[in-house]
């Protein structure tokens, strides 16, 4: 299994999963992207921009839901700094970087689904 690369593609994939789960906890809408959605000349910084931009809005929306949604959102929110490197990968991913990104994404999404069940999409 690919591991985190020096430029943070594995962590960027984990961050993408965390941002998607935060969005889902806030809205209960959509399906998580499949790993293949991140293949083919993608730039991690662009894949993460919308989720990072709406993170606080999603946190506030989830707060209004309260209960288990809020508890899950707090846990996910607390993990985000671990996935956020000093600089997001800003160039098109090569095949190894792509594999690391997808592996990080799939690993983290699976962990959230195991921990939060249907709340994680």
Task: Give each language-model segment a name.
Residues 1-121:
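Intrinsic-disorder/low-complexity detector
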């Amino acid at each position: 299994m690919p591991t985190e690369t020096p430029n943070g593609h594995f962590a960027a994939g984990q961050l993408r999963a965390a941002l998607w789960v935060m969005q889902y906890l806030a809205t209960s809408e959509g399906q998580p992207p499949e790993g293949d959605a991140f293949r083919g000349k993608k730039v991690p910084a662009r894949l993460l921009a919308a989720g990072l931009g709406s993170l606080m809005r999603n946190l506030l929306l989830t707060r209004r839901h309260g209960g288990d949604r809020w508890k899950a959102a707090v846990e996910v929110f607390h993990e985000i700094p671990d996935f956020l490197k000093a600089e997001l990968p800003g160039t098109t991913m090569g095949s190894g970087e792509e594999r690391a990104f997808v592996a990080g994404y799939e690993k983290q999404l699976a962990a959230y689904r195991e921990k939060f069940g249907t709340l994680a999409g």
